[in-house]
Amino acid sequence: PDARFCVFPGDFVETGTNRNSEWEWERWFDEAVRPVIMQMPIVPTDGNHDDSSNQNYTYHFNTDNQFKENAKVKPQFDGTTYSFMYGDVLFLVYSLQDYWKGSYNLSTLTSTYLTNDVGNWFREQVAAHPEAKWRVALVHKNVFSGSGHQEDEETPLFRETMLPIFKDCEIDLVLQGHDHCYEIIGPVDADTRTPILNAISDVETVPMNMVSNMTGKKGGVFNVNDGTLYFIGATCGTKRYNPNHKLTMEADYEKHKVENYYDLFTGMFGQPGRPSYSSFTVDGNIITVNSYKVYEGMEPMLFNTFHIKRTREHTPYSEKAHKTLEQMIQEYGTVKILHNGNMLIVRENIAYDTLGQLIYDNRD
């Protein structure tokens, strides 16, 4: 009851791809969440089940549409990518559903829409809010997951395109949906795609259960100074997936392409078996997450508490661009001096100036 708003990471309905899905939206608003929306605003993230040819999702929420208006490659729907500040936290809501817009290739793991439009938008938001002590991204489809969607063919593309953006923007936490399972992943080093083990402490060892707690871990403090924590809070509905076994993850290497994938699951990882939700309390350099199961006619039952910690301030994005000129040259390729004396950092048909701003992108 003390929450300031409710974050919902997508899939409000099951049959959104059907043009006749309005009855599900009516049930969602009138029955499922009426007590919630009468007390607080909802921060929506569009899920793959919410997307429909009649754009029904966009008629139910009033979110900012500047991203679509300014994007070089336009997303399908209005208001699916937006940001806002609340307290010390910058929230960046975005969608991975449009990765195929513009030019993309699942073999080379490239998407001009994600790398350019979404990536540049992330950088603009971070640069515009240097006062933010925390940077939290919200998305439906997973960058990392260990359940029903671990094998999705587009997920490696999401990692290849989004991890450099998360690193560049020093994103602390990514709240995901899609997988209907409870998963604490990381903090992940964006370059090596491995957990930063010295950033994890106070994780309790508990009896392992093949469904409710695959890792046999509970609680923990996760320091995100040098990496990003990924969290999926299971589901508040009735559609549930079970966690994948370590052997399954190893066998699926050719699909997910991440070495020692199971090691990324550094906290509790399992299926609560009941509708669940998590509360987030921000207090200075600590975010406390309490996760609850819901039983009809009973008080919610706390089943896990963990803490996210940041002990170092973010680098202001403008300063970071100045400091990383040599790294940018190494990453993006050669340096060209223009006739007016300005310097560009160029790779193929894309160029940045020395502040890291995109100058042109002629890739199709």
PLM segments and residue spans:
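Alpha-helix C-terminal capping segments
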Residues: 1, 129, 343-346
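Divalent metal-dependent phosphoesterase catalytic cores across multiple superfamilies
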Residues: 1-46, 50-80, 116, 123-127, ...
